[in-house]
């Protein structure tokens, strides 16, 4: 799939790390380092603008290494970039650790995954088909 992209950062375009990778790492495009204090969140620019085909979205997901080693994740995860959005891709990062974390220019801060999606059409009804689970909610399917 070919996707139009504008790169206003001075970093290379995102690439897949392996032939089986689902996501590409995005990099911070900042003039000076940004320090996130514990529980602080900030919008981090990437310098990237994309034009997705209709029927696709770009999902923004945390990087597992940043989450495990530093407690850094994304506030709205996954974030969605719609096919009709043309603004800069910005990443809402949060520091869930108890120590400050500094983001450097060019640092890999998240993953971008391209995914196909459908738009639903609601069918108003008075009842739904029965299932084994029924209306069982949170934790209903067991602990194991």
From Swiss-Prot:
<feature type="binding site">
    <location>
        <begin position="63"/>
        <end position="65"/>
    </location>
    <ligand>
        <name>substrate</name>
    </ligand>
</feature>
<dbReference type="GO" id="GO:0006226">
    <property type="term" value="P:dUMP biosynthetic process"/>
</dbReference>
<feature type="binding site">
    <location>
        <begin position="80"/>
        <end position="82"/>
    </location>
    <ligand>
        <name>substrate</name>
    </ligand>
</feature>
<keyword id="KW-0378">Hydrolase</keyword>
<keyword id="KW-0460">Magnesium</keyword>
<feature type="binding site">
    <location>
        <position position="76"/>
    </location>
    <ligand>
        <name>substrate</name>
    </ligand>
</feature>
<keyword id="KW-0479">Metal-binding</keyword>
<dbReference type="GO" id="GO:0046081">
    <property type="term" value="P:dUTP catabolic process"/>
</dbReference>
<dbReference type="InterPro" id="IPR036157">
    <property type="entry name" value="dUTPase-like_sf"/>
</dbReference>
<dbReference type="GO" id="GO:0004170">
    <property type="term" value="F:dUTP diphosphatase activity"/>
</dbReference>
<dbReference type="GO" id="GO:0000287">
    <property type="term" value="F:magnesium ion binding"/>
</dbReference>
<protein>
    <recommendedName>
        <fullName>Deoxyuridine 5'-triphosphate nucleotidohydrolase</fullName>
        <ecNumber>3.6.1.23</ecNumber>
    </recommendedName>
</protein>
<dbReference type="InterPro" id="IPR033704">
    <property type="entry name" value="dUTPase_trimeric"/>
</dbReference>
<dbReference type="InterPro" id="IPR029054">
    <property type="entry name" value="dUTPase-like"/>
</dbReference>
<dbReference type="Pfam" id="PF00692">
    <property type="entry name" value="dUTPase"/>
</dbReference>
<comment type="function">
    <text>This enzyme is involved in nucleotide metabolism: it produces dUMP, the immediate precursor of thymidine nucleotides and it decreases the intracellular concentration of dUTP so that uracil cannot be incorporated into DNA.</text>
</comment>
<comment type="pathway">
    <text>Pyrimidine metabolism; dUMP biosynthesis; dUMP from dCTP (dUTP route): step 2/2.</text>
</comment>
<comment type="similarity">
    <text>Belongs to the dUTPase family.</text>
</comment>
<keyword id="KW-0546">Nucleotide metabolism</keyword>
<dbReference type="InterPro" id="IPR008181">
    <property type="entry name" value="dUTPase"/>
</dbReference>
């Amino acid at each position: 799939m070919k996707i139009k992209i504008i790169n206003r950062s001075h970093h290379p375009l995102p690439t897949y790390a392996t032939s089986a990778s689902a996501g590409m790492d995005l990099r911070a495009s900042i003039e000076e380092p940004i320090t996130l204090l514990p529980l602080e969140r900030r919008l981090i620019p990437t310098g990237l603008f994309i034009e997705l085909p209709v029927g696709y979205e770009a999902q923004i997901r945390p990087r597992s290494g940043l989450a495990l080693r530093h407690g850094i994740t994304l506030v709205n995860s996954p974030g969605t970039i719609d096919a009709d959005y043309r603004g800069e891709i910005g990443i809402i990062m949060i520091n869930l650790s108890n120590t400050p974390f500094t983001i450097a220019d060019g640092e890999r801060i998240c993953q971008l995954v391209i995914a196909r999606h459908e738009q639903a059409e609601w069918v108003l009804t008075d009842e739904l088909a029965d299932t084994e689970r029924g209306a069982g909610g949170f934790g209903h399917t067991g602990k194991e």
